A protein has these predicted regions:
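Conserved pre-catalytic core of RNA-dependent polymerases
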Residues: 1-134
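Catalytic palm active-site di-aspartate
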Residues: 6, 40, 70-81, 132-136, ...
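Catalytic palm subdomain of template-directed nucleic-acid polymerases
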Residues: 79-96, 167-194, 247
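Inter-domain linker/hinge segments that demarcate the starts of reverse transcriptase
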Residues: 21-26, 52-64, 179-196, 261-263
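Short, conserved micro-motifs composed of acidic
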Residues: 184, 199-233
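Active-site palm subdomain of RNA-directed nucleic acid polymerases
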Residues: 22-40, 141-170
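Hydrophobic (often cysteine-bearing) scaffold residues that line and stabilize catalytic clefts
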Residues: 10, 14-19, 52, 85-86, ...
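Basic, alpha-helical interaction scaffolds
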Residues: 156, 226-266
Length: 266
């Protein structure tokens, strides 16, 4: 299995303590003032990966039972947490009304950061870090939530659900007009990524058509001129979603490792 190195933030104890205090107070302000997008399920109290999945499956099942086709696209950011520009993060912190004290701390927290690679007994030169929320920190996920919080505002009247950096844009399909509208949502999302220096990964963005119809409506969606592939199943947050919403493929994937283990024991 390919191993991807994970950066380790080096911060002193006092900094970590202040970070946790600021993270806690920031989330309280965001939640009490209803600043965060309603359907953002990541890194929030009483909202989890499970709540996001249940919400989507319930919605898709309802539409399917009503004989309504739902087209959806799962959008993945390329390098997600590593792409967030520091100066623009501070700007959004100000935009959402955080105190000047908190803004000063965030500015200091993100400024003058460097990274280095240690391999065995060799250490590389330090390189300045001007983007990316520090992973492994209490503030990192909150800064990311704040940064992508206005994505749904670009997609006016859209249907979008988020779990941190995983975005699902969807729409019930009745006529060709709905398909064209969904394509407009995708283009609005592209405008957001260009405005805020982020990037979606077109090769990992697929279209799933959830329907009970024998002859579902077809439309060729695209991002950056890249024709999106229509798939019959997609793995999302640990579950396998089929276009007919059956669970046999997910069940097989979950039980297959145990089956292989039994074969080894034999």
């Amino acid at each position: 299995m390919k191993q991807v190195p994970v950066p380790i933030p080096l911060t002193c104890i006092s900094c970590k303590l202040l970070e946790h205090i600021l993270a806690s107070n920031t989330m309280k302000q965001l939640e009490s003032n209803n600043i965060l997008f309603e359907f953002q399920h990541g890194f929030r109290e009483n909202r989890f990966c499970e709540s996001h999945v249940i919400f989507m499956i319930h919605l898709l099942t309802y539409n399917k039972d009503e004989n309504i086709q739902t087209d959806l696209m799962i959008m993945n950011f390329a390098k997600d947490f590593d792409k967030v520009p520091h100066k623009r993060t501070v700007y959004k912190f100000k935009y959402y009304g955080m105190s000047q004290q908190a803004i000063n701390y965030i500015t200091s927290f993100l400024s003058n950061r460097t990274k280095t690679v240690i391999l065995e007994n060799t250490t590389s030169e330090k390189i300045p870090v001007t983007s990316g929320v520090p992973q492994g920190t209490a503030l990192g996920p909150i800064l990311f939530l704040i940064y992508i919080n206005d994505l749904p505002q670009y997609i006016k009247n859209s249907q979008i659900s988020l779990f941190a950096d995983d975005s699902i844009i969807y729409r019930p399909i009745h006529t060709l007009t709905d398909c064209l509208k969904l394509q407009e949502y995708f283009e609005a999302a592209i405008q957001w990524e260009q405005d805020w220096l982020m990037a979606f990964h077109p090769d990992e963005c697929n279209i799933l058509r959830v329907t009970s119809k024998k002859k579902p409506g077809h439309f060729y969606y695209n991002i950056h001129g890249h024709m999106l592939q229509t798939v019959h199943s997609v793995k999302y947050l640990g579950i396998t979603i089929l276009s007919d919403l059956k669970w046999n493929k997910h069940h097989l994937k979950q039980t297959d490792p145990y089956h292989s283990f039994d074969e080894i024991l034999k």
